[in-house]
């Protein structure tokens, strides 16, 4: 509830140095005169006449006051009554401009107080009594004072639970220091006073609230064109109670710096509305396009954008932060079907409230009109992502849903990657989830972990990837048979019933009956004989029984099925117990087999099916005996055996290091090699001649 941006205190340096000019001169033209020829030139402070106009320059104090008041205006516009900002002016003493009371948290009170303070006088002699430290001490004392919200929380909790009330804050000090040493001294004094204040707030004194944490931002401002010896520094943790960051900025750019800081302090975002059609002030018959920058919560963009959208950003001239550019959308008539649902609304305030484009946009919205804003898609098209409208004298930005919303129908599960799939076993998956459901018990059930590991091991996602589960739609007794197989408490009667069903399959295979399924993935099953179909069915059935062989009745069923397979001419090879289990939940019986190369003499259909079954059996019997590391290691060894090993490894004794290029640099060896390379060339020349 009480965040760090709940309390913000501005400490303004009111010493003599802040009375000097900022050295940014502004041309002021008379109504009936012409603009001065050197309107943008710089000169001495004061009035400089030239042509038909004059120039003036703001003082450092004026720049600091204007930018800090704009900061608090943005805060109070976007968080009315929720965030508090105080001002303290420091010269020979600390002057409190306003308090935490809501009656002083408004623009009129602050501006009237600043007018009474006035610009620092240049006639005052320089003295050590003029210091910003007075204001920093008063700021720490102000942080210890409770706000109205904290007072209400204290009343609810009671005086015994005061330490539970969070109390964090931020102090923004606008001053001017000579060098880094002076800035370091300022940090140390602030940290010392902060610790002393917490000591006073602790029992038994209890003078105010304990400050949990403080964020000190020091803005070192200088006139335009003046180099400062104070270096910028990012956020640094001085102590568990204090974080400090330092920014050196010229006086004309302090407003951009504070706008940049307020984005991070209050989690805001900048949006520039571009291409706003507006009548020109001097020519009412023509119009021009203008841009207006507004500030709002960052969530206005984050909840709108999806993976198909990218925010168009740009950096304003003179600023250091990014702003999102959204285009003004010409109002058009649309029905209810064209309106997007609103994901959220957030208060909006313009950056430059006194400019003519901002004033025109605000009046346009306050008169009951709405503005749609467009953002580009990655595909090149555009989408209406935001809407500006006003209600009750306040302007809001509405984030519109440009992606699939929760009110839209969910995408079909059949339209997945790889094409359209229409035979997902959704009902069976629901039954599996019900069977795998666990409930908390006071005493641990030792049978629960095996159940969780056993049930999901073999579950084909689609009907077309399994013969056994495909046939349960066509064979009446098969669903009940599969249900009995997964029972943990199978009895003798269930075993006899299952054996009868297995014998029925054997009799059907003996008669040569074709299994009652016709299509797999929309095409006919490519098996030449009914015998091959039964072999695949027996194989999958054996895998399923092995997974559920938890009782003696399951093992009897497994032995009965294996004996039938042996009588049928498809006896399983002996392998490790883990081989078939690994095969059961890694591949389905209809997965493509890795066939051996077929010679020209064995290209018949029956030999193809036999090789299919043999390859499948070989893979089932051997895949569980080798791990992935064994497979990769054997592949690397087979590749390394194809080429000779490094001679240094072969010739160097164990424990010694082989020397690369031992003959490199040996002149005798080089001469021998050179002579050996020249001799064949001489022989070739003699042969050619």
Swiss-Prot record:
Report what the Swiss-Prot or TrEMBL entry states about this protein's PTMs. Answer: Phosphorylated.
Span list, region Disordered: 578-619
Q: Which residues form a coiled coil?
A: 521-550
Keyword check for Cell inner membrane: no
The answer to keyword Disulfide bond applying to this record is no
Ordered alphabetically, the record's keywords are: Cell cycle, Cell division, Coiled coil, Cytoplasm, Developmental protein, Differentiation, Meiosis, Mitosis, Nucleus, Phosphoprotein, Spermatogenesis
| Nuclear localization signal (NLS), short sequence motif: residues | 613-619
Query: What organism does the record attribute this protein to?
Result: Drosophila erecta
Tell me the protein's name. Protein asunder
Role summary: Component of the integrator complex, a multiprotein complex that terminates RNA polymerase II (Pol II) transcription in the promoter-proximal region of genes. The integrator complex provides a quality checkpoint during transcription elongation by driving premature transcription termination of transcripts that are unfavorably configured for transcriptional elongation: the complex terminates transcription by (1) catalyzing dephosphorylation of the C-terminal domain (CTD) of Pol II subunit Polr2A/Rbp1 and Spt5, and (2) degrading the exiting nascent RNA transcript via endonuclease activity.
